[in-house]
From Swiss-Prot:
Residues in the signal sequence: 1-22
Protein's UniProt name: Protein Wnt-8b
Organism the protein comes from: Xenopus laevis (African clawed frog)
GO biological process: canonical Wnt signaling pathway; cell fate commitment; determination of dorsal identity; gastrulation; neuron differentiation; positive regulation of transcription by RNA polymerase II
MF annotations from Gene Ontology: cytokine activity; frizzled binding
Amino acid sequence: MFYTGSFWFIFFILPAIPFCHSWSVNNFLMTGPKAYLIYSSSVAAGAQSGIEECKYQFAWDKWNCPERTLQLSSHSGLRSDLNIHSTGASPAGSGLYDTGPTSPVWSINFNRILFSRLESHFNKTFLSRLQIPFPQGHTVQSATSLSTGFLSPANRETAFVHAISYAGVMYTLTRNCSLGDFDNCGCDDSRNGQLGGQGWLWGGCSDNVGFGETISKQFVDPLETGQDARAAMNLHNNEAGRKAVKSTMKRTCKCHGVSGSCTTQTCWLQLPEFREVGNYLKEKYHKALKVDLFHGAGNSAASRGAIAETFRSISKKEIVHLEDSPDYCLENKTLGLLGTEGRECLKRGKALSKWEKRSCRRLCGDCGLAVKERRADMVSSCNCKFHWCCAVKCEQCRKSVTKYFCVKKEKRGGGIPRKKESKLKKKL
């Protein structure tokens, strides 16, 4: 499988999609729990790849896609909650299975919900063979009693998380389909033999992006049961994520002709590296559109109509949000924000981009913090040599590196900060 891992990661609540729902893709019909079992691991892995890409794209931003603020809540309170179960150790103080305002993104456990909803269809012996891990102290019976008090803000960062997560789901489903992981789909050859443009025909094995789009929609979009502005925003950003995958598809061609003359070409569409999808959506994030609607509205037919009309007028490729972002320089426990104090930044390095080189100014200076230099020793393998037969032996080299961190500005004698002290001197 293209994306796998030692965890289950998913961001929706299964009860929103009835198990009697029928799935029809490429003339292959599935009903009931089988559909979830076949695709759930790809959906989970795709969501995880989206979050990892989010962390990469915002690594040197004030908001760096922190786990505590990734919850994709919506008007129902539990529509889009992210969850992760990992066999590795969780970060200190992460509260992996806590709930409440400061709970991390992974507060709702998909595995418990999956088990509880499948119990009525399969016996427990079969379910135990699936080897879906449970958090300590939780059972199938407790799976339905889930709640959280944290509703993520409808700002551009939440919008990006929706878009990149659902792009990851569609991307992974498409890739795994082309790799033959599903019996009911394969390459998209629907246009093979047709004229694609001057001098080339469709042919080869195109990645089946239509399959990935269809399944991701059927898994995700029905969860948005609300008709308010927040639900409309989430659905719009879901689609923006899927459009990003389609917009970044690459056309690959093969020449045909005598002696490599390339008289004609056959071409097919391939998925790009997921990094390109992330780059595409990061640009959309910077140009995100704010929709001036009250995001709690939606109880009347008139307001629902106004919301629908507003979102129809916006391109599906654009990321949209309803609220302004908070000040990410500052700690905000209610929103699960830690601020930029203590964050590492970059200053020097040949391979650094302009954005990375300016990270200390952005994370520290712009937030009223100082940059502190720290020296650290790193040990790594070096001078590796191949020895017959058959081993590679390396030396352990110690290297001193310089790292930079954002810290509070030092105070001079008397406890007066430097800026305030200079103002005081002027008055005197």
